[in-house]
């Protein structure tokens, strides 16, 4: 069981939460990025550098993640592919993607892409708030408790 992070777009405050969680849970944490990352020394934390390019990091996460893993990403298509493989997916704002919600999120993403392509300014997400950080930490903990329960 591994926690995979789409690290190029993951906020540093979320990475810090994940570093502490990896130590506490004693789970491998792999940060996948197309640039060098500085991470704390730990036998549980490692980086995986991939070539620069569109979806290269996403494709590597999909290739390596397995059922039971957790993928941290705000990228809806990556989350959908991880869920198809049996992994859990969580965004940095603490929203867990599920098979029931991912289709709706993909549809909304495609709709927003269409609006942007037609020249309509849609704006980006708000900056990460303290509430978002707390929601992320709480959902990560909830996932971990579910994992422990399923192990019996």
Curated annotation (Swiss-Prot):
Domain of life of the native organism: Bacteria
Recorded family membership: Belongs to the UPF0178 family.
Organism annotation: Escherichia coli O17:K52:H18 (strain UMN026 / ExPEC)
Matching PANTHER family: UPF0178 PROTEIN YAII
Lineage, opening ranks: Bacteria, Pseudomonadati, Pseudomonadota, Gammaproteobacteria, Enterobacterales
Membrane spanning stretches: none
Family matches, as InterPro entries: UPF0178 (IPR003791)
Full protein name: UPF0178 protein YaiI
